């Protein structure tokens, strides 16, 4: 073997920074909402986005929107964009997609959850502890949906 033969590239993953990118708290029906018994309907919407910052740096943004309602009145709406910059190199395209779509959001979620809890309390509402999210399952479902959508036009072309 030649000494000049290139060794296989080792995968690199490093968290470089976690930060709060955007934050919003609204309590449109306060103070009247404080007079009602606290039995809210809580809805959580989440989304992830990523973009390449440099050759081996990626920004991943986890957006959580929490809406708490009492009957038909909105008690509060909290939106948090928790972001991170990750150094990622040496992964296959499939590994990179899963890392950006599942692994990085798993790292960011506890920070977003803590911020949401703190904002609810600062807004004079009871603490709101969000349940863990299985980003691996969400990612796997998104991949499955994408594959089904790609297969559908191929099936139509056959008929």
From Swiss-Prot:
SUPFAM superfamilies per UniProt: SecB-like (SSF54611)
TM helices/strands, residue ranges: none
InterPro entries for the chain: SecB (IPR003708), SecB-like_sf (IPR035958)
Family matches, as Pfam families: SecB
Any one GO cellular component localisation term in the record: cytoplasm
Gene3D superfamilies tied to this protein: SecB-like
Protein name stated in the entry: Protein-export protein SecB
Native species: Hahella chejuensis (strain KCTC 2396)
